[in-house]
């Protein structure tokens, strides 16, 4: 099997923010056991910023971009040093792979990442992946590493995604504040994964919470990948999750896997704007998988160019689809509501072609 395992900042750092070597030792022991059993394992590890904070003498996590990026560069080196030392103790070679949003927005980079990671696995290495925070040109957090791990699971055609955290899994309420909260052990593939109310906040040392993990599970499910959310400190948690032993919360893989191109449009591409459509267009798109025509467009929000990815919403503001537009925002505003016969010469007859349009799952 091919496994993507993500461990969060709060699970591999101490309260002071330093790297918790024991946590990495436990994780790598599971990785080594899986490797001995013939499985490929990719680790997605948070913790660079948290590990860098005490190293540079700061009292707490900074909030400004420049300091966050600088601290990330310091912390990433320390984090990877620990991984390399521990993996070498098992006769394994760690390989640092840093990714940024461009690697999931640009199709060429997306495929290049797949080839590089695939080759590392062929060579017997254990890729340790993190977001390339130190040189991010926009927001430091591209979603979060939960989403990154889910996109990698799709990219690598993984069999299972394991999200390791400081909770036992998904609960009916936040167990840290509600004593009546109970563990949800399984979520079916046809269950709207994001409909369950969760606390979106993570720990003070990380950027992800349960809401981001549910979003990641949704991406993975529609990639045909089983997902498990479980407590990182549980003995043998990664091995048990891969084996299918009852641990944490399991999200079943959907039996209808979205093609790579459509999954990329739905979950990975940067959104440049929004197109609001009338009820007739929504019904045609949702039930008959038709293209979106200018006649069905009610309004255009944002500034985007031909080829950009946009949200498609109904008149109630509900986003139900995403797609790659065949014209710029300025051109589309000039043809809102027009029938094909009324379009100016040279104007595309399809705002979004059906092959570039994805009705969002759930």
Region spans (language model):
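C-terminal catalytic "cap/lid" subdomain
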Residues: 1-61, 65-93, 97-362
């Amino acid at each position: 099997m091919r496994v993507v395992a993500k461990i969060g900042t709060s699970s591999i750092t101490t309260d002071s923010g330093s790297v918790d070597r024991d946590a990495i030792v436990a994780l790598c022991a599971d990785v080594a056991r899986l490797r001995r059993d013939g499985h490929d394992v990719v680790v997605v590890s948070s913790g660079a910023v948290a590990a860098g904070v005490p190293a540079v003498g700061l009292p707490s996590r900074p909030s400004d971009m420049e300091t966050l990026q600088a601290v990330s560069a310091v912390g990433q080196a320390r984090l990877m040093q620990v991984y390399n030392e521990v993996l070498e103790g098992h006769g394994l070679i760690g390989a640092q792979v840093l990714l940024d949003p461009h690697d999931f927005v640009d199709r060429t980079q997306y495929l290049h990442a797949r080839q590089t990671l695939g080759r590392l696995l062929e060579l017997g290495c254990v890729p340790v992946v993190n977001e390339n925070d130190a040189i991010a040109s926009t927001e430091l957090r591209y979603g979060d590493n939960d989403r990154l791990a889910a996109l990698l699971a799709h990219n690598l055609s993984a069999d299972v995604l394991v999200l390791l955290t400081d909770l036992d899994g998904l609960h009916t309420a936040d167990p840290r504040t509600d004593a009546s909260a109970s563990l949800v052990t399984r979520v079916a593939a046809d269950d709207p994964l994001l409909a369950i109310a969760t606390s979106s906040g993570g720990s003070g040392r990380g950027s992800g919470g349960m809401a981001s993990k549910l979003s990641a599970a949704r991406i993975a499910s529609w990639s045909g990948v089983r997902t498990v959310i479980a407590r990182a400190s549980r003995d043998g948690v990664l091995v048990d999750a891969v084996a299918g032993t009852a641990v944490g919360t399991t999200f079943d893989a959907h039996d209808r896997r979205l093609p790579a191109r459509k999954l990329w449009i739905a979950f990975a591409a940067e959104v440049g704007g929004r197109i609001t459509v009338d009820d007739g267009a929504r019904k045609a798109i949702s039930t008959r998988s038709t293209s979106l025509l200018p006649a069905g467009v009610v309004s255009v929000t944002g500034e985007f160019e031909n080829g950009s990815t946009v949200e498609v919403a109904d008149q109630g503001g509900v986003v139900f689809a995403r797609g790659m537009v065949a014209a710029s925002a300025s051109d589309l505003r000039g043809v809102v509501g027009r029938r094909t016969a009324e379009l100016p010469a040279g104007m595309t007859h399809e705002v979004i072609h059906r092959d570039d349009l994805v009705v969002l799952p759930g």
